[in-house]
Amino acid sequence: MLKKTLAALAIGTALLSAGQVMAADYKIDKEGQHAFIDWKISHLGYSYIHGTFKDWDGTFSWDAAKPETSKIAVDVKTASLWSNHAERDKHIASKDFLDVAKFADAKFVSTAVKSTGEKTADVTGDLTFHGVTKPVTFKATFNGEGKDPWGGERAGFNAKTTVNLNDFGIKGPGPSSQTVDLDISLEGVKQK
């Protein structure tokens, strides 16, 4: 009788474990140039300056069945900003704005993911930028997941937010340039 009870318990535990889906860990695919952090800011209220950060890295965990358990962490080297104009890049990197010599890194670490639709979520986390940490929420869209041609698995997302520069101790260059829009595209390779 004890053997039958133990066998039933073992089978039940195995079946329950098999039914549980665990969040998978992904490395953001920077090497393959399948991930970007782009930004834009108003120029005098007449047009927009667009740019990107070239040096950054990150990871995320993703569970399609339980998106609220997902997490993301990103580290950006602020000196890697690029706006297709070398003199402007130097000025943005200077003490006048980002002061990249003093604040070499910007970091985002998620604290909560709230599903807002079938393929959308609000991703809230702590953004550390210019030596200040503040909560920020990104509007994220799940693009898809599946196998790649090289035998791996991938998942992809887009996320957008607007950041007020004054919140991070950065004085914008004018009244129309107090906010910066961030547009992030992430494709991650599932880790084994």
UniProtKB/Swiss-Prot annotation:
Chain segments annotated as coiled-coil in the UniProt record: none
As for subcellular location, the record says:
Periplasm
Which keywords has UniProt assigned to this entry? Answer: Periplasm, Signal
Which SUPFAM superfamilies did the record assign?
A: YceI-like (SSF101874)
Alphabetized InterPro entries for the sequence: Lipid/polyisoprenoid-bd_YceI, TTHA0802/YceI-like_sf, UPF0312/YceI
Leader sequence residues: 1-23
**Cellular component GO terms, alphabetically?**
periplasmic space
Record has Signal as a keyword = yes
What PANTHER family would the database entry show? PROTEIN YCEI
The record's family statement is: Belongs to the UPF0312 family. Type 1 subfamily.
The protein's matches in HAMAP family, at most eight in alphabetical order, are given as:
UPF0312
Query: What is the protein's name according to its record?
Result: UPF0312 protein PFLU_5725
State the organism named in the record: Pseudomonas fluorescens (strain SBW25)
